[in-house]
């Protein structure tokens, strides 16, 4: 009875001879011959020692398989973990013990590290490993490694899948694309199952029920392993996060079934953490004060820029924590997650956040005048903004631009603009702070004479200042000219200058 491995020999051989003799005393040796067609012959032959010898008569075009280096490459690729010695032209081929088949209790850390170095042909030890065995729902053993370094992070090409599929220690598929999800392509190691046939094809793997069960069980255990490191050894996890955070974010977007588990692996900078520290979503929720119903976030190029955003003023006043999204991918991830622990993610720059301070700012007469300024600003800005309104959330800044309900952030819009130059930025909501000195000055000027040129100049520059802060100011020359005009006005009439 021959397997697919033997029959594949006819792909390179025009004829195959098998000479075999039993260990039993005075047994007869036999010669089996076939050209790989529909028949074969068996006849008596001479052989002094017991055992089996297979002779391949190669086709003319397959002479490369007579080269020792070619044969050595094949042996090392497919059979470097077989339990018996292999010799090539009298030389014993180096092989490694399949340590994944051994009990974990008998293996030391150095054994795992040495195996990883051999397996990956590297001098670097792994960051962590996961060794597990399962008999149900399907039998398999696995040994997975997380590297210390991400080659993608170094700017090299996209990492190819690094988990090899074995059956009884024989390589079935190197770098299988079907055993681990795409976002975990950085994971290295082996999966071995006796229930996987040696002749399984790529198409069969994709539709194999056993493979699917292995994949689900293995992924569950690996994500739990990573979460365990995050909980017990944050310093080690921070190194994993530094190298593979984009992979976890990719998974949180693409893997709906495991999205909840992947959300546990995410880390963020925050208004409640030091500059060099990161927090996870579970820690954020634990710190939420009574009355806070949503998880707030704000994006920006760096922490310093975010902390200067006027949108944070109301959150500081109420002592509500805000996640700082420093990676352009972060907002995309939270948009797909939508919620965590039944708490919805909410952009701190959203115009519909119900955090405004109650009551009025100033006396009724002044607020009426401020309302008249709002009407004036709407006329000046026209289609540049969606709305102008009195703010109940600002404490220190004169104004801010907010996103309409469910609208994308300006950071997301800038990415869209980079992808599509014809993309039109959405209209924002401008809120003005009636308690700020600049707004009070503009209210007074409007009450004095709505037609004052300086008032319009201030109004246009007010909006430009917000656009400049957010990096969306398009007409810088006009803005500079306005600033110069304001500076001249501040200097007094020309006849006072000597």
Where are the model-predicted features located?
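Conserved GHKL (Bergerat-fold) ATPase module
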Residues: 1-7, 11, 15-498
């Amino acid at each position: 009875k021959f397997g697919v491995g033997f029959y594949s020999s006819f792909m390179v051989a025009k004829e195959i001879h098998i000479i075999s003799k039993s260990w039993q005393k005075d047994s007869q040796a036999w010669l089996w011959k076939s050209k790989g067609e529909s028949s074969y012959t068996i006849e008596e032959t001479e052989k002094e020692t017991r055992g089996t010898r297979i002779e391949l008569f190669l086709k003319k075009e397959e002479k490369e398989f007579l080269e020792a280096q070619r044969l050595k490459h094949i042996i090392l690729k497919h059979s470097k973990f077989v339990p018996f010695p292999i010799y090539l032209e009298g030389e014993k081929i180096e092989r490694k013990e399949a340590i994944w088949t051994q009990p974990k209790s008998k293996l030391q850390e150095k054994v795992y590290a040495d195996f990883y170095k051999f397996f990956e042909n590297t001098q670097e030890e792994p960051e962590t490993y996961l060794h597990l065995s399962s008999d149900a729902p399907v039998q398999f053993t696995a040994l997975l490694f997380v590297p210390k370094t991400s080659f993608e992070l170094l700017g090299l090409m996209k990492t190819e899948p690094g988990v090899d599929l074995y059956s009884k220690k024989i390589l079935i598929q190197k770098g299988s694309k079907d055993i681990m999800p795409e976002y975990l392509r950085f994971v290295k190691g082996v999966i071995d199952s006796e229930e996987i046939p040696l002749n399984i094809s790529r198409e069969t793997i994709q539709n194999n029920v056993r493979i699917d069960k292995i994949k689900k069980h293995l992924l569950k255990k690996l994500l739990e392993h990573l979460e365990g490191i995050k909980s017990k050894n944050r310093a080690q996890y921070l190194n994993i996060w530094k190298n593979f955070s984009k992979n976890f974010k990719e998974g949180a977007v693409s893997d709906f079934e495991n999205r909840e588990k992947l959300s546990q692996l995410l880390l963020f900078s925050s208004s409640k953490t030091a500059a060099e520290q990161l927090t996870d979503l579970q820690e954020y929720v634990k710190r939420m004060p009574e009355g806070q119903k949503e998880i707030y976030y704000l994006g920006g190029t760096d922490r310093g820029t975010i902390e200067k955003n006027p949108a944070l003023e109301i959150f500081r006043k109420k002592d509500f924590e805000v996640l700082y999204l420093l990676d352009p991918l972060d907002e995309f991830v939270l948009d797909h997650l939508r919620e965590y622990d039944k708490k919805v993610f909410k952009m701190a720059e959203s115009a519909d956040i119900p955090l405004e301070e109650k009551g009025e700012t100033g006396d009724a007469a002044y607020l009426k005048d401020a309302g008249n300024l709002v009407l004036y600003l709407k006329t000046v800005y026209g289609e540049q903004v969606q709305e102008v309104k009195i703010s109940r959330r600002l404490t220190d800044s004169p104004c801010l631009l907010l996103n309409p309900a469910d609208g994308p952030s300006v950071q997301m819009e800038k990415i869209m603009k980079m992808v599509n130059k014809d993309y039109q930025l959405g209209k924002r909501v401008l809120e003005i702070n009636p308690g700020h000195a600049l707004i009070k000055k503009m209210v007074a000027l409007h009450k004095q004479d709505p037609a004052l040129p300086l008032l319009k100049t201030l109004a246009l520059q007010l909006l430009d200042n917000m656009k400049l802060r957010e990096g969306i100011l398009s007409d810088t020359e006009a803005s500079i000219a306005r600033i110069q005009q304001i500076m001249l006005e501040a200097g007094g009439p020309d006849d006072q200058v000597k």
